[in-house]
């Protein structure tokens, strides 16, 4: 009886393999069973058994599938006709066989089990030989090791690991980089003869002697081919998401590169080619000037469900001085006055920035001047110039404001200049206020198709309204299913549907309500939705990415079919060198990860995996995220594929300027990944600098714990 390991709640395809021997041209068969009566599986699982055909017949990969429903205790046993006692599986006895032995007998029993396990791995490799032949030569060893690892994971080896530990050997799970070499080393150590065993047990695909140094060298080469060379003193790259704000500052790109950024990420779900091109031009120029290599990664939007665009709010900003509990001003608001695009010095942190039209107006200002204006409410206000700074070829001023003011585009600024001459300037480029709806528990939200937001809802008068540009939502959801917004910040239950509307009752939000704005994520984890791998927009954007970026991110990968479509598009464009980052952010993408990797290894492009923890947590449940992250890292390490850890890394620091303790620990744990991604925010430069410091820090104890997992 061979029990499957139940410690991994979410497991990819489980492969169990067997060989077939011939005695007098007759197949001597033995029946084996797999019992899962002790398992509770949270999602559907598939068991696949690979069987070889008879003598002289071509090898095949036969699949016998059985699935389990959600959270059910399944008493289920399968019987299959397997070969005789030479079958590798038959050597794996029950746990009691080892627990009842000791001394030399115990060692002999462990060796017997390890030999049987090795036969199991080699059989897995042999039966997948036809598929492995299709892998690109640079990934052949990686794919073979991944097959070994998945074959190992198909068995319950917990008891065997326990006995290896009692004999002073490491667990079989501890070295994913070369599973077979680690297994051979364990056998050799137990037999006390390094050359006694491995001579007759070789891979279907021979390779040189595996050592820890060689393994790490190969992994580093895969990392560098995708992400570029590492900064000195670091073993992990830093990726930063930037948008249009990077084009409004002359120093932003320089600052984040100096802080430690080695990869820039652009999200094709936002902006357009004109904005992307300006960002990339600045990154390339600054990287060359600073002699700091920086690669450009562009994420295709993918078939993600998002809220539609809301009408922009008014172009007005609020400037407020700090007040005490009695409403008395304790310190003025600091305002940066400048020409459009002129950033303040790094040590200056203004409360607001006012762009002024008119070089003559700024040129005539002096420290001590008092600027007069009439704000959007008709209130008279003054800004007192306190400091002057020369920034590149421009000049900016810091002004103090002692009263609350609402400034809008077109507001007139005036000041008495030299010889009593009155100088006049106008406020320009005040960004529009972000529009949103504030949702509370019990509220009703009507989601409509794009273009119908202005049409009043007849069915639910007075309800909040948003649009969704994707027809998938309206074609897939049913009443009673849950729906999440903005990475799980808001949850609701679908109350009704029609061809053009979905009615949602809000079940989770903050007590005072949670804002939901434009282009925020929508998740429907219980719905049976079938996306295409690449949308028409993705294919169009891929042409731009191919000629401008170093890497492309493929969003919402779900199965092997998505990879097949991607390979076809890459082949059409002859993009053999473009880095590919597959984003794992759905339940099906996680479930099919090993098969997705094996399919992706059929092309020669540099390959990586991004763990998109935001959507993954919403799709699969917060309580499962940690285990799923570890599972993904372990599988990618076996495949020797670089891992990018993303979503909410140092998010509080990025947004508020102060990190949480949990964020620091999370960032330190991210050392195990090949790259860590930070999202944009007003304190992003400080966040990159802190992350760079954390990644440079080396533990002086337990060195193995800080080694990279890939």
Swiss-Prot record:
Cofactor requirement: Mg(2+); K(+)
SUPFAM superfamilies with a match to the protein in the record: Phosphoenolpyruvate/pyruvate domain, PK beta-barrel domain-like
One Pfam family linked to the record: PK
Cellular compartment(s): Plastid, Chloroplast stroma
Binding residues annotated for K(+), in chain numbering: 267, 299
EC number(s) stated in the UniProt entry for this protein: 2.7.1.40
Similarity section: Belongs to the pyruvate kinase family.
Record-given protein name: Plastidial pyruvate kinase 4, chloroplastic
């Amino acid at each position: 009886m061979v029990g499957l390991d139940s410690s991994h709640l979410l497991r990819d395809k489980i492969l169990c393999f067997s060989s077939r021997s011939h005695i007098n041209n007759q197949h001597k068969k033995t029946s084996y069973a797999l019992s899962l009566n002790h398992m509770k599986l949270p999602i559907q699982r598939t068991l696949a058994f690979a069987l070889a055909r008879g003598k002289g017949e071509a090898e095949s990969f036969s699949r016998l599938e059985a699935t389990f429903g959600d959270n059910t205790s399944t008493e289920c046993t399968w019987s299959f006709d397997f070969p005789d006692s030479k079958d590798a599986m038959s050597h794996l006895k029950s746990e009691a066989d080892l627990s009842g032995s000791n001394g030399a007998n115990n060692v002999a029993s462990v060796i017997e089990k390890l030999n049987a396990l090795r036969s199991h791995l080699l059989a897995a490799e042999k039966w997948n030989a036809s598929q492995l032949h299709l892998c690109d030569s640079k990934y052949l060893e990686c794919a073979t090791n991944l097959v070994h690892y998945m074959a190992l994971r198909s068995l319950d080896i917990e008891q065997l690991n326990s006995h290896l530990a009692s004999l002073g050997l490491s667990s079989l799970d501890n070295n994913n980089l070369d599973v077979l070499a680690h297994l051979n080393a364990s056998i050799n150590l137990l037999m006390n003869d390094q050359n006694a065993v491995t001579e007759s047990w070789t891979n279907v695909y021979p390779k040189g002697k595996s050592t820890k140094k060689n393994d790490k060298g190969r992994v580093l080469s895969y990392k560098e081919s995708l992400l570029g060379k590492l900064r000195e003193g670091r073993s992990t790259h830093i990726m930063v998401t930037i948008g249009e704000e990077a084009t409004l500052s002359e120093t932003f790109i320089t600052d984040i590169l100096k802080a430690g950024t080695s990869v820039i990420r652009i999200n094709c779900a936002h902006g357009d080619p004109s904005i992307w091109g300006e960002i990339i031009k600045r990154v390339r120029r600054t990287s060359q000037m600073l002699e700091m290599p920086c690669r450009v990664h562009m994420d295709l939007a993918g078939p993600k469900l998002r809220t539609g665009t809301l009408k922009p709010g008014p172009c007005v900003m609020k400037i407020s001085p700090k007040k005490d509990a009695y409403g008395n001003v304790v310190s003025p608001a600091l305002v940066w006055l400048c020409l459009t695009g002129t950033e303040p010095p790094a040590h200056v942190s203004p409360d607001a920035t006012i762009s002024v039209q008119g070089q003559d107006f700024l040129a005539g200002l002096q420290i001590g001047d008092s600027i007069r204006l009439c704000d959007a409410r008709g209130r008279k206000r003054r800004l007192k110039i306190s400091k002057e700074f020369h920034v590149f070829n421009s000049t900016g001023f810091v002004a103090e404001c002692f009263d609350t003011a609402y400034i809008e585009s077109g507001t007139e600024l005036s000041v008495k200049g030299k010889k009593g001459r009155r100088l006049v300037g106008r406020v320009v480029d005040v960004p529009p206020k972000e529009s949103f709806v504030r949702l509370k528990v019990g509220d009703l939200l009507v989601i409509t198709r794009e273009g119908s937001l202005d049409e009043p809802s007849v069915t639910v008068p007075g309800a909040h309204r948003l649009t969704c540009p994707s027809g998938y939502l309206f074609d897939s959801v049913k009443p009673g299913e849950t729906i999440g917004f903005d990475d799980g910040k808001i949850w609701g239950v679908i109350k009704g549907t029609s061809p053009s509307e979905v009615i949602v009752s809000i079940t989770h939000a903050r007590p005072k309500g949670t804002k939901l704005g434009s282009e925020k994520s929508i998740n429907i984890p219980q719905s049976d939705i079938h996306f295409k791998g690449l949308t028409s927009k993705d294919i169009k954007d891929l042409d731009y990415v191919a000629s401008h970026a170093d890497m492309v991110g493929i969003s919402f990968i779900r199965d092997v079919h998505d990879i097949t479509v991607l390979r076809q598009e890459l082949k059409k464009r002859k993009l053999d060198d473009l880095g590919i980052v597959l984003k794992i952010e759905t339940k099906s993408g996680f479930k099919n990860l090993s098969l997705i990797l094996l399919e992706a290894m059929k092309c020669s492009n540099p390959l990586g995996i991004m763990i998109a923890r935001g959507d993954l947590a919403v799709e699969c449940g917060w309580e499962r995220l940690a285990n799923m992250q570890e599972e993904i890292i372990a599988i990618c390490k076996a495949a020797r594929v670089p891992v990018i850890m993303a979503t909410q890394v140092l998010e509080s620091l990025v947004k508020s300027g102060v990190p949480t303790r949990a964020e620091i620990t999370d960032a330190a744990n991210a050392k195990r990944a090949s790259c860590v991604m930070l999202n944009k925010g007003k304190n992003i430069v400080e966040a990159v600098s802190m992350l760079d410091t954390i990644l440079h820090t080396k533990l002086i104890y337990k060195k193995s714990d800080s080694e990279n997992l890939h």
